[in-house]
């Protein structure tokens, strides 16, 4: 009976996430200066029918942005889950540990260097630069983790690494041309605006391939959650496994930072929301729930960012912080009460 109840709960949870995703997808497509009926939206998406202005707005502007939000929101959430698993730390995440700031730093260097020479920047170059920055920051975090076993100190160290990277980024920006500063400033605040179908295709390839590998690692992750000794007894190569966790989480985080800039709290808050909804920590269930939850959370936050003070658009990172930070505070309070 318990197994049946759990199966029903899992099913209901995924249905809720799927319904929210569809609802927010339609709401986002319809939100903006031009409002369209659901039928008009469906005709444009599936039949490519509609007046020229509506078609251009939906197909060339809104759809690439919405799909980018779904893909990158899901990727960032899964990246946070992998980092929490690696460090066995409930508030580990790309933003808090300074990994996003490291990616931001290297991308800033690349943008200023190439834009000052009137050289366009491809999606692949941005992702590689962000990945390099993520790995550099992760290297520093791992060095600190070896010396410090206290959760609070690890988080503080990550925040300090983030501040250092941000300070260097600000220093670099002071020597950039005005036009380059505008491009970098808009990107560094965190935004899903300006996405193209080319960006979406690149995201799909990178995130899909990474997620396939993550799914295949569900069983080793499940064993690792029960302790390194147990995982070793189950045949998991701990060194290879830990390296893969770092690489996969960094790739997902780098992809997000390259296209949308640093986005806060999604990688921390959503995995805990997914676990609370499912009432389980099984990776085979939590990973897809994290992806769907991250997509839903970011769709909601992007909708707020675009519409609340329209035509002025808020930074997506500011909105995610407003809704994500309370979750982190709740996690820390609950953990303290258990001690």
Where are the language model's segments positioned?
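Alpha-helical transmembrane segments in inner-membrane proteins
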Residues: 1-339
